[in-house]
Regions:
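Short helix-coil junctions and helix-kink-helix linkers
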Residues: 267-279, 493-503
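Basic, low-complexity terminal or inter-domain segments flanking catalytic cores
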Residues: 2-5, 16, 23, 97, ...
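Core structural elements
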Residues: 141-150, 169, 199-201, 255-267, ...
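Alpha-helical scaffold elements adjacent to nucleotide-binding pockets in ATP/GTP-utilizing enzyme cores
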Residues: 16-20, 66, 89-97, 119-123, ...
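Metal- or metallocofactor-binding catalytic centers and their adjacent structured scaffolds
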Residues: 219-261
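C-terminal helical "lid" subdomain and adjoining coupling/linker elements of P-loop NTPases
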Residues: 159, 178-228, 275
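Intrinsically disordered, low-complexity regulatory segments
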Residues: 1-142, 223-227, 234, 339, ...
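C-terminal or mid-to-C-terminal helical accessory/interaction module adjacent to the motor/catalytic core
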Residues: 115-197
Length: 887
């Protein structure tokens, strides 16, 4: 009997399924998408009903050849990609490509929500057909994003600079961040006061707060004139200190708290950001590994959680039975909620998949600890705890509120104090969380104090109505209203979800794009828009009326949902979208200002709402008196004189402002050349350095390293060797492109020792005969093929000779982030991304003696640095040629 062929996306998933299905099935991986729109050109024929022109992705020819070979003689080909739009599209593309080569095979869709033996065997035993409505929704989204991405980005290139980009959802997310920052800048803090007190009864003290004055409730938000000044607050304090404190009422209420539902994708992303400090991308990468399966010793490979891309809170009946039995066994019958708790679905939820939950209640976190990485265990514990607590009894607290009158005999003034105490009577579902639940909100600006004292925490002594209490202290405490907080990843995801922008499965990519494009940066895990990001938003708002509004983007998502549900044809949805888009695009082409020749600063202020000039120089050049213009160059935005080249005045617009860097350790530094004081500066690229205050007469600079917001100088370091040309010591210098060795007699002696050829040990994936070497370009080290110029293949990140555990690509890239080193697969559709500690360490780069690779590199050949990656500070743009070596 011929084997059936099962195709999944990743090798890890394939290994797991192969163990479940046995010898009658051949399980292979397609490594994600096999076809897509070409990288160059729009490749959408509007005249033929938006017909897309797909092509096999580079590197997938060999994968498809292996799949065709594996399918020879197979009676059935099971397409078992993920159960969502992207997975459905992968299955459809596979069928379209493989069907001509396997005419006798029957193509069936195998779909499962969890990778367990029972779920997989059931899916293969009862396969279905490819859902063409899902495929249509994916095609519509892909085509819309291609039209917007190419045509709006092309507009930015023509008006501003080559390399800028915009996107249907990415630009809306960026706009949200920019508008929040503008709101913060316009915010004016308002001072106000409160009067916290400490009361006592029989030597037991407890906190209270003045909440009433002259019989009216006080407002603690800066709007109450009765507490607007310290003098007014001190008058209240004086009254309380001279008053008798009599208890007016004591009220005890019982409050029940029900647990939150099991995780949806967005809620998991938010909780992981708040509780674990994970980025959205990191959360999804770890969840993917938990879903695809982990080797659990004698148990074999098991998928630990259900599919992690879902907006549903629904749970399978058998899972509900299992979790309630687990609660009963661990905490007793009283801990189980009397009724099975079923959570209401949010409006617009697809409900195609279950909520994210453990696949087996027989695998608590303690049972799998030794098989998981640190990140995997943390996230699995979060999913486990959330699911278990969702079927537990409510927590019960008793809240006691004591209202107290402060009155002076013979006077009309009366102050009202309130003390609140909370006692947890039954932990209920909180037992599963140990300390605290994961529903702590990240947002909130801290405005307002509330009526209770110290938020009602703690126990109060026994107090009865009519009793007199003692006063320990009463003070006037100053406050200021706070601006709305910046968005972190969790709060931005929450905002996007609540407003229907994008889908949870796309949030990680959206946040990655706006950060990689250098449109935002992070400070204290919060997004701050860069000058470039502000400019892009202003240009989009100027050129497009409502195309990048949250409401329009949300309506577009609803239409894609209708396509998936089968109530709207995908071509009709595209036609409606494109009709408006073409009109908006042409209007923007005429309306949008151009920065190609520079834009006068006076016009910048009139035109742009969100763009801000740090260290604003005014409208005229301080050297020539001509107008100043905003311009865009290879290193980013800057200000220049309109009289150029007669006047060479320029001013940088740094991404990180000097006042955000702690330069306390650099105070008192003097110039080695002229003795003048040195001052912290930031260049156009955002890099910090010490510059001589005697500039331009003295141009001496010292590189500065900024880490954690703190700056430290990096002076030259002697190597212990002498210059062969002049005899002076050789030193390690710290240039803008990295460290290098040179003569300390520079500039009189320009000797620099030749660099050895350094290989990474990775074979070139393009020409397959060369080797990837370490090279140095104008933007720092990069990695290029030894066969340059015949083969131009290069990398910005360091490749290492280690196969990707997910897709099998024979190398991974090393990326350094604030959280440490990460290993990333660049294969499109793979998305593998893991911390260094999760993988074995790689061998260091091998140094090869000079001339060892002469034959491979070619005499005198110099490989150009790659174009700046999206992670660099500013786009390199058109015409960015590699710096030529002198001599």
């Amino acid at each position: 009997m011929a084997k059936s062929l099962v195709i999944v996306e990743s090798p890890a998933k394939a290994d797991t399924l192969a163990k479940f299905l046995g010898k009658d099935f051949s399980v292979r991986a397609c490594y994600g998408h096999v076809r897509d729109l070409p990288r160059k050109g729009i490749s959408i024929d509007r005249a033929k009903g938006y017909e897309p022109s797909y092509e096999v992705l580079p590197g997938k020819e060999r994968v498809l050849a292996e799949l065709k070979k594996a399918g020879k003689g197979a009676g059935t080909v099971f397409l078992a990609a993920d159960p969502d739009r992207e997975g459905e599209a992968i299955c459809w593309h596979l069928r379209e490509v493989l069907r001509p080569a396997l005419p006798a095979a029957e193509f069936r869709r195998a779909e499962f929500q969890e990778i367990t033996k029972s779920a997989v065997t059931r899916a293969v035993a009862h396969p279905g057909k490819i859902d063409m409505n899902r495929v249509g929704a994916q095609q519509a989204r892909r085509i819309i994003d291609r039209l917007v991405g190419y045509e709006v980005s092309d507009l930015l290139w023509s008006k501003v600079w080559r390399g800028l980009s915009a996107g249907r959802v990415q630009t809306v997310a960026l706009r949200i961040v920019v508008e929040r920052e503008t709101e913060r800048e316009k915010f004016v803090a308002v001072p106000y006061f409160s009067v916290p007190c400490t009361l006592e009864k029989q030597d037991v003290s407890f906190p209270a707060r003045v909440v009433l004055w002259h019989g009216e409730k006080l407002r603690f938000d800066g709007t109450d004139p009765r507490l607007a000044t310290r003098e007014a607050a001190e008058a209240v304090v004086a009254h309380v200190r001279s008053s008798a404190l009599r208890v007016l009422s004591v009220e005890a209420k019982e409050r029940k708290s029900v647990p939150p539902p099991p995780f949806t994708t967005s809620k998991l992303q938010q909780a992981a950001a708040r509780v674990l400090g994970f980025t959205v991308r990191r959360t999804m990468q770890v969840a993917q590994r938990l879903y695809e399966g982990k080797a659990l010793g004698e148990r074999g490979t098991v998928g630990l959680i259900t599919y992690m891309r879902t907006d549903s809170t629904r749970t399978a009946e058998e899972a509900l039975v299992a979790v309630r039995e687990t609660i009963r066994r661990v905490w007793g019958e009283a801990a189980v909620n009397p009724e099975v708790r079923r959570f209401r679905q949010k409006k617009g939820a697809q409900d195609a998949h279950e909520a994210i939950r453990p696949t087996s209640m027989d695998l608590p976190p303690e049972a799998v600890t030794r098989f998981l990485t640190s990140d995997e265990l943390k996230l699995y514990r979060l999913v486990w705890t959330r699911f278990v607590s969702s079927q537990m009894s409510p927590s019960v607290s008793e809240i006691t509120t004591v209202d107290i009158e402060a009155r002076v005999d013979g006077r009309d003034e009366v102050a009202g104090l309130r003390a609140t105490g909370t006692v947890l009577k039954d932990a209920g579902w909180l037992r599963a969380h140990g300390e605290a639940a994961d529903e702590t909100p990240e947002e909130g600006n801290g405005n307002g104090i509330g009526d209770d004292a110290e938020n009602g925490k703690g126990r109060l002594p026994q107090i009865g109505e009519g009793e007199t209490l003692g006063l320990v202290s009463a003070e006037a405490e100053g406050h200021e209203t706070q601006p709305p907080p910046r968005f972190g990843e969790a709060s931005l995801v929450k905002f996007l979800e609540e407003n229907g922008i994008g889908r949870p499965s796309t949030y990680a990519e959206i946040l990655r794009k706006i950060e990689d494009r250098a449109y935002v940066r992070k400070k204290d895990r919060r997004f701050i828009p860069t000058p470039l990001g502000r400019l892009v938003v202003d240009l989009m708002l100027e050129g497009f009326d409502d195309f990048f509004e949250t409401g329009y983007t949300a309506r577009m998502e609803e239409e894609l949902d209708e396509v998936e549900e089968g109530s709207l044809d995908w071509r009709k949805a595209l036609a409606e979208f494109d009709g408006k888009f073409v009109k908006d695009r042409e209007r923007a082409r005429k309306k949008m200002v151009s920065l190609k020749a520079g834009l006068p600063l006076a016009e910048v202020r009139k035109t742009f709402v969100h763009f801000r000039l740090p260290n604003d120089p005014g409208d005229t050049c301080p050297k020539s008196g001509d107008a100043l213009k905003l311009r865009m160059g290879k290193a980013g935005l800057f200000i220049a004189c309109a009289g150029y080249p007669k006047c060479d005045f320029t001013q940088d617009i740094p991404e990180v402002e000097e006042d955000e860097i702690d330069a306390s350790d650099l105070e008192g530094q003097t110039c080695d050349d002229c003795g003048s004081p040195m001052k912290l500066r930031t260049g156009r690229s955002g890099s910090a350095f010490l510059g001589c205050t005697a500039y331009p007469a003295c141009r001496n600079t010292v590189p500065v390293r900024v880490a954690g917001g703190k700056a430290e100088a990096r002076p030259d370091v002697p190597t212990g060797e002498s210059c062969p040309d002049c005899g002076k010591p050789l030193v390690t210098k710290h240039g803008r492109y990295g460290d290098y060795v040179a003569c300390s007699g520079w500039p009189a002696c320009r000797y620099r020792p030749p660099k050895p050829v350094i290989t990474t040990g990775v074979a070139c994936p393009e020409c397959r005969t060369g080797e990837i070497l370490v090279r140095r370009g104008r933007f720092g080290p990069f990695y290029g093929c030894s066969n340059y110029p015949k083969c131009p293949r290069n990398f910005r990140a360091r490749p290492v000779p280690k196969a990707c555990p997910s897709c099998g690509t024979p190398y991974l890239l090393v990326r350094d982030r604030k959280a440490g080193a990460f290993f990333v697969c660049e294969k499109e559709g793979c998305g593998f991304d893991a911390p260094a500690q999760d993988l074995e360490l790689f061998t260091p780069v091998t140094k090869v003696p000079e001339g060892a690779l002469t034959a491979a590199t070619g005499a005198g050949a110099t490989a150009p640095a790659p174009k700046r990656s999206a992670r660099t500070k500013a786009p390199r743009g058109a015409g960015g040629k590699p710096r030529k070596k002198k001599g």
